């Protein structure tokens, strides 16, 4: 859908299958993505635009990426391999950042430094261990993996047998290295450093595959930001906690989350000019796909009456039923109909709810008896109940939570205050990882 909209906006015509295929091949197909595109690295990983970026969902990993400033897929793979409990406990992250800033980790040998050049002198990947075993220790290729397994088993607590195996492998490594021109002390030092890093070495092929997925996300964020935001929000629709976090991230990028609206919402999240995002109908309880199809096919609606009745006075709705309309009223999703407020048909949304939902059957029966009588019945009930007070804030919050699963934080905290918190770098406590200390804000839900 996003591709179709993109092509329509540029060409002013409805795209055919080949138009969509060609656009995809030129812009989104894996072969079209340049993994060396520095604009992507700088826009996302350096500036910290994290909304929906794979491998960068926690504050800790985000901070590490901004410190490490990746410029290649291998850099991303290295960062994600380091950002694990073992390497972090051993301060490998600090060693890596220092190395990126010119304080290279030196093994005392040019051949070793060359093998570890792409990871700034640190042994990060198990594949590097195999290369060291072959090129430095002189192990035949088929024996290299045995060394890797022996070292890994020793490191993860494989018992006495594993320790003995690693020790015997050490002798073989040192002997092979000496045959390759190393003195015994240097060879032993290289092996001991291999042992140190082996507890944290990660599988490179696995890390690179994940890094590519992360880069694809960053690529979409860089070149198709609005569409990426919409896709990200759609993916969060079934999880209220994650959706609240997504809202916070997206607001931090300058976007405004608009209210659901009968005339502007669609089946998917929609981006409007001015960095505005409109929710999908389908992310709200009570509004099914068949109801959405009917809503969209009959738009635009100029007022409430044109939404409920045909020009001849007959009832207009079938799939768009009472439950769906009630959901729209509860989340105040009829603003574009301009029928709620002072000197309007309805004083507030509670008034509208009481009239339309409360007298639904009576209004429909009146319509069946005589076209236009239903409209008159609705107006009469509305005029007779104008003293209806609106829902208080707690009730509005409950309405939204019941329909959406979570409430927009702007219902609790004014947008101006949120903007100041974002500007100062103060996050919601939901965005702070359990093992980290940071300053955050929160709202008290209830006091017993």
Predicted regions and their residues:
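Noncatalytic, beta-rich nucleic-acid-contacting surfaces in large DNA/RNA-processing enzymes
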Residues: 1-448
């Amino acid at each position: 859908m996003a591709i179709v909209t993109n092509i329509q906006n540029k060409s002013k015509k409805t795209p055919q299958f080949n138009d969509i295929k060609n656009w995809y091949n030129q812009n989104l197909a894996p072969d079209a993505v340049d993994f060396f595109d520095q604009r992507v690295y700088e826009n996302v990983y350096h500036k910290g635009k994290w909304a929906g970026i794979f491998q960068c969902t926690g504050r800790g990993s985000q901070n590490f990426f901004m410190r490490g400033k990746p410029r290649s897929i291998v850099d991303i793979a290295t960062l994600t391999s380091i950002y694990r409990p073992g390497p972090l406990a051993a301060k490998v992250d600090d060693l890596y950042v220092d190395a990126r800033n010119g304080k290279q980790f030196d093994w005392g040998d040019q051949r070793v430094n060359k093998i570890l050049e792409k990871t700034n002198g640190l042994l990060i990947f198990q594949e590097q261990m195999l290369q060291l075993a072959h090129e430095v220790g002189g192990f035949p290729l088929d024996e290299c993996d045995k060394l890797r397994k022996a070292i890994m088993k020793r490191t993860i607590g494989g018992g006495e047998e594993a320790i003995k195996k690693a020790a015997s492998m050490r002798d073989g490594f040192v002997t092979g290295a000496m045959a390759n021109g190393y003195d015994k002390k240097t060879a032993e030092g290289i092996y001991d450093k291999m042992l140190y890093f082996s507890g944290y070495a990660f599988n490179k092929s696995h890390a690179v595959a994940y890094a590519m997925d992360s880069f694809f996300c960053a690529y979409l964020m860089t070149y198709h930001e609005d569409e990426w935001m919409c896709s990200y929000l759609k993916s969060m629709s079934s999880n209220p906690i994650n959706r609240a976090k997504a809202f916070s991230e997206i607001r931090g990028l300058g976007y405004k989350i608009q209210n659901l609206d009968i005339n502007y919402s669609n089946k998917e999240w929609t981006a409007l000019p001015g960095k505005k995002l409109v929710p999908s109908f389908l992310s709200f309880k009570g509004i099914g796909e068949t109801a959405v199809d009917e809503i969209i096919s009959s738009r635009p609606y100029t007022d409430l009456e044109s939404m409920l009745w045909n020009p001849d006075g007959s009832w207009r709705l079938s799939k768009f039923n009472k439950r769906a309309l009630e959901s729209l009223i509860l989340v105040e999703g009829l603003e574009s109909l301009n029928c709620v407020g002072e000197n309007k048909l309805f004083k507030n949304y509670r008034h509208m709810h009481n009239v339309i939902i409360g007298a639904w059957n009576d209004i429909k029966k009146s319509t069946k008896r005589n076209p236009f009588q239903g409209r008159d019945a609705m107006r009469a009930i509305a005029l007779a109940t104008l003293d209806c007070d609106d829902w208080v804030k707690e009730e509005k919050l409950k309405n939204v939570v019941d329909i959406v699963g979570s409430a927009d934080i702007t219902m609790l905290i004014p947008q101006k205050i949120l903007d100041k918190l974002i500007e100062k770098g103060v996050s919601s406590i939901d965005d702070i990882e359990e093992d980290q200390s940071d300053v955050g804000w929160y709202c008290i839900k209830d006091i017993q």
